[in-house]
Amino acid sequence: MNLKKHSERKFDLITVGRACIDLNAVEYNRPMEETMTFSKYVGGSPANIAIGTAKLGLKVGFIGKISDDQHGRFIEKYMRDLAINTDGMVKDTEGRKVGLAFTEIKSPDECSILMYRENVADLYLTPEEISEDYIKEARVLLISGTALAQSPSREAVLKAVSLARKNDVVVAFELDYRPYTWKNSEETAVYYSLVAEQADVIIGTRDEFDMMENQVGGKNEATKAYLFQHQAKIVVIKHGVEGSFAYTKAGETFQAQAYKTKVLKTFGAGDSYASAFLYGLFSDESIETALKYGSAAASIVVSKHSSSDAMPTADEIKALIAQAE
């Protein structure tokens, strides 16, 4: 897939959706009830992907709504310090807060997240706050599935996708399913399908694609056949420790292994995977190599305490791949 076109545009990538606060337990191997110390990081899948791709050297912008308070200012400064453009970032004027995610790390196999997502600012991004002039400066627009969970954010995202299609901007859709933001599975399937049918690149886990198709135990062959009837050029389906698969509209299939690592926690892997996979495509690497980049980046992030701070450099990704091979 050619991401080299429109190289004159200001941004390689603009991500759309939530930016929130992650409070990760400093004390491992204990329940949250006994945890006294947490470290603060920027979180939220589209924010993490913006951070991950910026660390890999891409020119990145962000569209989303944040709180007009200390947490919102922390998020904005952190992203600006990484040279992420925040002209598309909107401050909520009605007192809404950013989401908070407290993480519990009992063991590498037993991690959980306690979410505070009631009345959060990011889900109140409105269609009027989506700028065509901003979006048409991007080569790729990345949509987060969670941003579709509620109005008016849902309509804002659909407008962004429409403007991207109008201005020859590649649409990437990271399914990013979070059950706590949706009313029911039928609603999820409707809006996921609506965006997936307009996306050029779709990335998700096998379980997330099952949510899109409103079924259990779905098969990759059926998923790709459905998506290739529409706009999709590349479909990436992740199967955890079994590795990941990429399918192209031209009929090619690629596979990458999951790289072994000392796992500290399980969250953050998907965001680092998407960041590195897209970086691989922008770098004109083969899809097979881009898959390796994604798998290696995920392996690095799950071995570290944070998600956003732990997003790897290209050298770190390539070193892990070389070591494994």
Swiss-Prot record:
Listed under catalytic activity are: 5-dehydro-2-deoxy-D-gluconate + ATP = 6-phospho-5-dehydro-2-deoxy-D-gluconate + ADP + H(+)
Instruction: List the Gene3D superfamilies.
Output: 3.40.1190.20, putative 5-dehydro-2- deoxygluconokinase
Q: Name one GO biological process term.
A: inositol catabolic process
- Cited CDD domains: KdgK
Sorted UniProt keywords: ATP-binding, Kinase, Nucleotide-binding, Transferase
**Protein name, per record:** 5-dehydro-2-deoxygluconokinase
State the pathway, as annotated in the record: Polyol metabolism; myo-inositol degradation into acetyl-CoA; acetyl-CoA from myo-inositol: step 5/7
Could you tell me what this protein does?
Catalyzes the phosphorylation of 5-dehydro-2-deoxy-D-gluconate (2-deoxy-5-keto-D-gluconate or DKG) to 6-phospho-5-dehydro-2-deoxy-D-gluconate (DKGP).
Source organism (scientific name): Listeria monocytogenes serovar 1/2a (strain ATCC BAA-679 / EGD-e)
PANTHER family attached to this UniProt entry = 5-DEHYDRO-2-DEOXYGLUCONOKINASE, HEXOKINASE FAMILY MEMBER
Q: Does the keyword Kinase apply?
A: yes
Entry EC no(s): 2.7.1.92
Q: Which family does it belong to?
A: Belongs to the carbohydrate kinase PfkB family.
At the top of the EC hierarchy, this enzyme's class is transferase
Instruction: List the molecular function annotations (GO) for this entry.
Output: 5-dehydro-2-deoxygluconokinase activity; ATP binding
